[in-house]
Amino acid sequence: MAEKNNSVIPSGKVVYNSSIVRSIIELAIPKVEGVVNNFQPGNSSKNYIKLEFLENFNVAVDVAVTIYYGYNITDVAYNIQQSIKNNVEAMSEYKVGTIDVHVVDVIFDGSEHE
C-alpha cells in the first residue's frame, strides 16, 4: 500500500500519496540532457528510484540512470540532482535532502545495451 503523508493548512488538509513524489521524479529525470529515458511502467532493470520519507516533509532520493556516451557524467548527475530538487520542491510540500545518483550504464551510438 502506498505511504501517505498529511499536512494541515488553515483551509483544510492536503494528503500526499508517496507515488506522487515518484511520478514527479520520473518526469524530471528524462528532461536532463544526456539521460536515456527508460522510465516506463514495469521497467526497473536499468533505472530505479528509491525514496525515504523523513520527518518534517523531508525526503531522501536514490536514483539510477543510464546516460548517453559523450556527456560528462559529473555534469549530468549534478543536473539530475537539480532537476529532482527543483521539481519536487516546486510541486509538493516536500524538501529534498540527499539525492544520490548512480550511473549504471552508458549507451554508445544511440543503441541500448541489453
PLM region spans:
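Short edge beta-strands and adjacent turn/loop segments
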Residues: 32-66
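Envelope-exposed proteins and targeting segments
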Residues: 57-61, 71, 97
